[in-house]
Amino acid sequence: MKIKVISTPVQNQEKALAFYTKTLGFVKKIDIPLSENNRWLTVVAKEEQDGPEILLEPSPNHFKPSKVYQKALKEAGIPYTQFNVNNLQNEYERLLKLGVVFSIEPTHMGTVKIAVFNDTCGNLIQLVEEL
C-alpha cells in the first residue's frame, strides 16, 4: 500500500491552482472537468512528479461538513497538512517575498523546525525541516 493522492479542501480551484503552482512551486499533474464547478485537479512536487498528488478538492463549496471542518481547523490555528522542506529559513524568506502570510514564523520544536502559513484557499499549511 502507498499514498497516491491526498485531498486538500479549497474554496476556489482556480485560485488554489495559481497559489500552489506559482507561489509554492508545485506542478499541475491532472486537470479533468467533472461538472460546471468541479474538476479532478491535482498538483505534485516539481522534484517528484511521479510522487504523491495533492487533489485540490472544492468540497467546502458543496459539502457543508467539509466547510465546517476546514473553518474549525483554521480558526483553531491547526494546519490542514504539512510539507517538508530542506531549508525552512530559505523557503520562509522566499514565500514572504511572494506575499505569503505566516501565522507562525520559523520555530524550533525538538527535532524539527516549523512554520505555518495561510494558503489563501481556506487552510493553514505547516512547513517542516527535519534537523
Tell where the protein language model's regions lie, with residue ranges.
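Conserved catalytic-loop position in the HRD/HxD motif
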Residues: 87
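Conserved beta-strand-loop-alpha-helix junction that forms the acyl-donor binding cleft
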Residues: 10-13
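Conserved active-site tyrosine of GNAT-family acetyltransferases
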Residues: 16-21, 95, 122
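Vicinal oxygen chelate
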Residues: 1-5, 27-83, 92-118, 129-131
